[in-house]
């Protein structure tokens, strides 16, 4: 319950005006409901001759009479006058019209209370999705190394929907039902405290039985949602690896794997659904037991000579008692739904509560560009729950220099350059820009002066224009076209069906690898960064595409400080300095010719590529 109240505090309070409106209309609905039921007693007593008492009007300000007695007496008095003047049949019709009017107002109030809750429910779901999405964008890259993308998607879709259906869906019950219970219970006590005392003794037994069924629902729901995440992750991997699956004729294997995930989810979801489905029949049965017990006890009282209530009042009491059963059933339903939804809240909170080690200091300094040098000072780095990847790397890069980093796969090249824009933070040593530790700089400013061109060109399912202008505010068409021309991309863009307004497809699937890379370079050119990071930007291209991309890169690198990672040594021969990284350490450094003369690691790498 504490977790549930915390969810309400976080997401419901911004919509308190809707809560207030719902409370008002629910209260009105409950009062009208009770008021219409109260007309049953005089109908039975007066119309069917059960009550023979002659009533006389009592002035409203009569001393010594309680308000209750005055109201009851005068109501019977006016009812008697109607019967005498218009007859029993007409009076019955009048009371029936009164009931119809009261019911119309009651149902109208109920509809208004439900309609008012709709904007709150949809707003809460929107708020959760936005909050999760914003959190995802703020998390470091290391988070996504530990989490499967399909699982994250499942939390944003399935779990958030479950929160809407279970938690916010139960919220309406939790607003309406307490009002109904208070009104109905007050009427029950007012009508017969003896019968109500008996009812109160029986109710806890029912509550215990209902609670026992729902106790394990949260754990079962959490397990089922985890299985659903595995299914979504499997689907995401299948869509992303479709080419490999077909190349290795692995359709059968993937089908079996997906079938297994789906069956596991089915079994888990079945257990949850069966337990949840037991809510209504169990509450129905227990409610009937309660009615029978009260009917027996009330009948016993009436048959006794000293009964505190008469038969019509007892019938009214039973009507109210039966009416109180439905709110209790709704509470029982909520007791199953809420734990199920809280399991989804727990999974969503795993994202929202994820720690972000990449933080910005309160007094972080702005940075407008690189004026002097970048310095890696005895840098050490280790991934979480892993061994150290970089061991005491020291490197100075002067403004305008091009530094190449080469080495075997797994030597730490990409990790080293990922430390500069603070995708990760060093675990030892420091990295400075113009003498200032990058951890003391504003993160947005730091990343704003760095441009990236990676081995895998990441494009969005958007137009050429928007992909090139990505991250650059108020970019004009002239600026985008100029960047595309420098990147050797303008020609094939103009050959597309709608030019710069052509959509490139999911992850740029409508383009070749070389075209995607040139669009990526155009994006970096438009950003106009002081520092450029090239991470094996031409390693996956054919000879012709590599030539065009290399030309674009050379234009991009002019007047910029560049850190280039390369497997093909031919692309970095003209670098001002080449650093050879081996097992997390710089083992050699110098120009291309100097390193060949050393006859060391670099020479061996070069000789292997000459074969």
Where are the predicted features?
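Transmembrane helices of ABC transporter permease
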Residues: 21-28, 172-223, 296-309, 326
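An intracellular "coupling" helix at the cytosolic face of ABC transporter transmembrane type-1 domains
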Residues: 13-17, 141-142, 158-167, 171, ...
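Helix-loop-helix
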Residues: 187-201, 275, 279-346, 351-352
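Hydrophobic alpha-helical transmembrane segments of ABC transporter permease domains
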Residues: 13, 24, 109, 113, ...
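Short intracellular "coupling" helices and adjacent cytoplasmic loop segments at the cytosolic face
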Residues: 48-52, 122, 130-154, 158-160, ...
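Membrane-integrated ABC transporters
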Residues: 1-38, 47-99, 105, 112-117, ...
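Juxtamembrane helix-loop junctions of ABC transporter transmembrane domains
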Residues: 33-41, 93-94, 98-149, 153, ...
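ABC-type nucleotide-binding domain
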Residues: 360, 367-611
């Amino acid at each position: 319950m504490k977790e549930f109240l915390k969810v309400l505090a976080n997401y419901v309070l911004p919509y308190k005006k809707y809560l207030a409106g719902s409370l008002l209309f629910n209260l009105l609905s409950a009062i009208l409901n009770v008021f219409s039921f109260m007309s049953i007693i005089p109908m039975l007593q007066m119309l069917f001759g059960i009550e023979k008492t002659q009533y006389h009007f009592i002035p409203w300000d009569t001393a010594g009479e309680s308000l209750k007695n005055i109201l009851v007496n005068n109501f019977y008095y006016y009812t008697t006058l109607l019967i005498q003047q218009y007859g029993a049949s007409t009076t019955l019709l009048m009371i029936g019209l009164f009931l119809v009017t009261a019911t119309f107002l009651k149902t109208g109030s109920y509809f208004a209370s439900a309609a008012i809750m709709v904007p709150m429910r949809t707003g809460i779901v929107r708020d959760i999705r936005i909050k999760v999405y914003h959190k995802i964008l703020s998390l470091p890259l290391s988070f996504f190394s530990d989490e499967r993308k399909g699982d994250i998607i499942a939390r944003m879709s399935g779990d958030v929907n479950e929160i809407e259906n279970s938690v916010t869906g139960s919220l309406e019950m939790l607003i309406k039902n307490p009002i109904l219970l208070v009104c109905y219970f007050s009427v029950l006590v007012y009508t017969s405290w003896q019968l109500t005392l008996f009812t109160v003794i029986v109710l806890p037994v029912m509550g215990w039985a209902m609670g026992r069924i729902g106790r394990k629902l949260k754990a079962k729901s959490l397990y089922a949602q985890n299985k659903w995440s595995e299914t979504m992750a499997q689907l995401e991997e299948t869509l992303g690896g479709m080419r490999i699956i077909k190349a290795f004729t692995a359709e059968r294997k993937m089908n079996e794997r997906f079938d297994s995930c789906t069956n596991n989810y089915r079994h888990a979801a079945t257990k949850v659904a069966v337990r949840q489905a037991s809510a209504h029949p169990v509450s129905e049965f227990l409610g009937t037991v309660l009615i029978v017990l009260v009917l027996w006890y009330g009948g016993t009282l009436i048959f006794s000579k000293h009964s505190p209530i008469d038969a019509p009042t007892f019938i009214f009491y039973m009507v109210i008692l039966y009416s109180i059963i439905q709110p209790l059933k709704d509470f029982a339903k909520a007791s199953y739904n809420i734990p199920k939804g809280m399991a989804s809240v727990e999974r969503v909170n795993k994202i929202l509560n994820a720690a972000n080690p990449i933080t910005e200091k309160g007094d972080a300094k702005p940075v407008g560009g690189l004026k002097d040098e970048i310095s890696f000072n005895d840098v050490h780095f280790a991934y979480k729950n892993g061994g150290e990847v970089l061991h005491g790397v020291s490197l100075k890069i002067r403004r305008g220099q091009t530094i190449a980093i080469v080495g075997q796969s797994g030597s730490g090249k990409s990790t080293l350059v990922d430390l500069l824009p603070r995708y990760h933070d060093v675990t030892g040593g420091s990295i400075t820009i113009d003498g200032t530790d990058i951890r003391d700089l504003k993160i947005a400013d730091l990343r704003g002066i760095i441009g990236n061109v990676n081995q895998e060109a990441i494009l969005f399912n958007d137009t050429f224009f928007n992909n090139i202008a990505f991250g650059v505010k108020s970019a004009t068409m002239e600026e985008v076209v100029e960047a595309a021309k420098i990147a050797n991309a303008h020609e094939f863009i103009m050959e597309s069906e709608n030019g710069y307004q052509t959509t490139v497809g999911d992850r740029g699937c409508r383009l070749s690898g070389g075209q995607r890379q040139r669009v990526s370079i155009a994006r970096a050119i438009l950003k106009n960064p002081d520092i450029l990071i090239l991470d094996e930007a031409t390693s996956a291209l054919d000879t012709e595409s590599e030539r065009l991309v290399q030309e674009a890169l050379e234009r991009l690198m002019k007047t910029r400080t560049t850190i280039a990672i390369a497997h093909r040594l031919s692309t970095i021969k003209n670098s001002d300095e080449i650093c050879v990284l081996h097992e997390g350490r710089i083992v050699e450094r110098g120009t291309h010719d100097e390193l060949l003369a050393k006859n060391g690691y670099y020479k061996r790498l070069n000789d292997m590529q000459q074969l």
